[in-house]
């Protein structure tokens, strides 16, 4: 893989739709590990690296992207993985003021903590944590769809965050009621 197409995101990247422990099938497709990476618009260093990696993947994938007439469509005319949360998910507070990328892999990502220790406890890495992601970009041309996709390599949890999209914890839903006599 061309190193120009590999990026490690900044420390304020938030993980959402984290299907990192078990692969998930979408609409009958082959099961994949995946995560949505929410990157603050203020993280211009990471966003610049991603834009350069997308450009490098486009250049390297020109043969794959070529149309029947021999022409390569401009980058602006094909699908790219970097999307604007304010435009595409305006009602989702987690995506406000951020870009996002959906990264996928056929193989499980390595998952480590801030000290690079492997995380084995599934409850430690969930939708809502903050950390870094090692991702790569590549061109694709499948079933008439052309674009640049994002592959998921590894993940690093740096800090906890409010869980996203999951159900609440029972400890948060209930309080201890000592005065009630449920049997009497």
Task: Give the location of each predicted region.
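Compact mixed alphabeta submodule
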Residues: 112, 116-184
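OB-fold ssDNA-binding interfaces and closely related basic DNA-contact patches used
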Residues: 1-100
């Amino acid at each position: 893989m061309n190193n120009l197409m590999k990026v490690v995101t900044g420390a304020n990247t938030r993980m959402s739709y984290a299907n990192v422990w078990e692969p998930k099938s979408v609409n009958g497709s082959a099961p994949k590990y995946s995560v949505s990476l929410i990157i603050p618009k203020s993280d211009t260093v990471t966003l610049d690296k991603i834009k350069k990696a997308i450009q490098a993947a486009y250049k390297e994938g020109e043969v794959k992207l070529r149309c029947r007439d021999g022409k390569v469509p401009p980058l602006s005319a094909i699908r790219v993985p970097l999307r604007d949360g304010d435009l595409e998910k305006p009602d989702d507070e987690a995506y406000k003021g951020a870009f996002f990328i959906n990264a996928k892999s056929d193989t499980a990502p390595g998952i480590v903590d801030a000290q690079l220790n492997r995380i084995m406890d599934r409850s430690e890495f969930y939708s809502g944590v903050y950390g870094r992601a090692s991702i790569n970009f590549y061109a694709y041309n499948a079933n008439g769809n052309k674009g640049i996709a994002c592959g998921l390599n590894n993940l690093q949890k740096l800090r906890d965050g409010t869980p996203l999209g999951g159900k609440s914890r029972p400890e948060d839903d209930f309080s201890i009621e000592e005065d009630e006599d449920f049997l009497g």
